[in-house]
Amino acid sequence: MFVDQVKVDVKAGNGGNGMVAFRREKFVPNGGPAGGDGGRGGSVVLQADEGLRTLMDFRYTRKFKAAAGGNGMIKQMTGRSAKDTIIKVPLGTTVTDAETGELIGDIVNKDQRLVVAKGGRGGRGNIHFASAKNPAPEIAENGEPGDELTIRMELKVLADVGLVGFPSVGKSTLLSVVTSAKPKIAAYHFTTLVPNLGMVRLDDGRDFVMADLPGLIEGAANGVGLGIQFLRHIERTRVILHLIDMSGVEENDPFEDYHKINHELTSYDPDLLKRPQIVVATKMDMPDAEANLEDFKAKLATDDTLPNTPAVYPVSSITQQGLKALLAKTADLLDTTPQFPIKGVDDLKHRDYTTEADADFSIDNPEPGLFVLSGDKLERLFKMTNLDHEESLMRFARQLRGMGVDDALRAAGAKNDDTIQILDYSFQFMD
């Protein structure tokens, strides 16, 4: 089964907790703090795999979780950092945040890696909090929580050349003749239900990847038929081979068919018609093909709706008429055509996990005497506070005061003994 869209839940590992410990060696009185730092949590990383052609592996496995870092230890020993969880995906996979729609990255290069959920840093042990006023601190941080999100992966096949056209115009037959691919071929519409890839190799040593895309029909850009589900795969192609059936068996006007497919391409993305396009007149071994081709060329010559008049190459996949000339022209176009930018990907600003601005805290007053605090920075500080040690709690209180939380609570109407809630933890407000 070909799967080209999937949602996956990913959870990076939390950092290990820092430790509160003291030196207790013989003959070392008042040895001081010796609690080590926690290890880094594992990240969830996508890695390109040239052997994969579909996202089928994610049909039943939808959750991936990286391991947490090890806790800090005595004698200033740092906990073990966790290994990253590597998820292999096919080339051409675009990754977005399923909740926000933010583009995270695009997997287009061999062995490329993309961090989609970053592991939390380890909490600091009490060796970091010693001072002249407090030489033996009972303060240590919990590990930073790892990122947790749902990502959407979308596969857009990586091919240099895309075959487009109505169903049963001969796309799969052409691919099977000029490459070693073996697509399903039958005498009915929509035989091809998934993209098929093949490598074309010319006698002069040039080669390129060709994709046979499922047949389009009117309204495809709006989801009719297989529709937009496979139009996305055209985005990465550099040259479009537009196949037109000249046999007349379907009793369609080849020129009208040509315009209908171009209309669907334009409706999906107007820039697609700016790409090099070759009209491939197929089934030229049929009796009426020559007459239909001449009529098509005459209409095309007077058509002023196109930005450029495409070259027309008559071929027959059965007799192999015209195939060498077609492939040579295609290779020539590829030699002079650069990669086209993928909209929303090439201008992507990759996430910077170290400089991302923290959200301001907010205060909610759902009922009299209850104030709920929330906010990314505030909640992260809370999660990294070791609630088992009073000095850690006092440090957290100072951090809140430094953020202006105390003043904001007073301004919101908080009074002595009112309940303050952060996540699942509650305490009393003391003015």
From Swiss-Prot:
The gene is obg. The keyword Hydrolase applies. One of its GO terms (cellular component) is cytoplasm. Its cofactor is Mg(2+). This is GTPase Obg. GTP binds at residues 165-172, 190-194, 212-215, 282-285, 316-318. It comes from Lactiplantibacillus plantarum (strain ATCC BAA-793 / NCIMB 8826 / WCFS1). The lineage of its organism: Bacteria, Bacillati, Bacillota, Bacilli, Lactobacillales. PROSITE patterns: G_OBG (PS51710), GTP1_OBG (PS00905), OBG (PS51883), OCT (PS51881). Its main location: cytoplasm.
